[in-house]
């Protein structure tokens, strides 16, 4: 989910009226992540099977030529849908993205690219880990976004990159 900026949360349909003061939010760290309950989702272009592992150390779907040290996931379906759709859009493959139900195999933390940016806390429930994610299920029945919305998001992300503002904290 590293591609998503907090400024896009409202546009993407996330409820940013979280009714939370900054002092009420408890950051998710590698030391307390065991308190976070799934299910967890990962959206991608990769064709995987149950039991497969998703690991960091592979090229980013969104930043050509960059190898990521983390792998990203969410406990909300919406970020996974965007992840799947944008991975396919940037690959220009024309196929449908895939969403997997995953299980972290090690500690994880809040995704710093989204946490405490425009809104307090982590309203997208997005996380990252340096350990593999195990595929424990496949979600086939999910509602994607309109092609026009995906196109607008791709254009916005490309514009950020052109302006040197598409920085991924990995």
Locate each region found by the language model.
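Short active-site loop/helix that positions an aromatic residue
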Residues: 77-91
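Active-site and NAD+-binding cores of ADP-ribose-processing enzymes
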Residues: 3-5, 18-22, 35, 45, ...
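Generic secondary-structure transition motif, activating predominantly at the C-termini of alpha-helices
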Residues: 58, 88, 158-161
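ADP-ribose/NAD+-binding catalytic cleft of ART/PARP-like enzymes
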Residues: 3-71, 85-86
């Amino acid at each position: 989910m590293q591609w998503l900026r907090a400024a896009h949360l409202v546009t993407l349909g996330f409820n940013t009226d979280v009714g939370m003061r900054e002092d009420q939010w408890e950051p998710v760290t590698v030391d307390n992540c065991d308190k976070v309950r799934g299910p967890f989702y990962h959206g991608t272009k990769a064709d995987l099977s149950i039991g497969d592992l998703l690991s960091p150390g592979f090229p980013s779907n969104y930043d050509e030529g960059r190898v990521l040290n983390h792998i990203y996931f969410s406990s909300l379906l919406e970020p996974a849908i965007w992840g799947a759709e944008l991975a396919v859009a940037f690959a220009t493959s024309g196929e449908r993205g895939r969403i997997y139900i995953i299980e972290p195999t090690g500690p994880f933390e809040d995704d710093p690219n989204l946490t405490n940016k425009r809104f307090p806390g982590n309203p997208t429930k997005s996380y990252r880990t340096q350990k593999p994610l195990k595929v424990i299920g496949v979600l086939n029945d999910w509602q994607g976004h309109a092609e026009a919305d995906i196109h607008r998001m791709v254009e916005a992300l490309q514009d950020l990159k052109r302006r040197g503002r598409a920085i991924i904290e990995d």
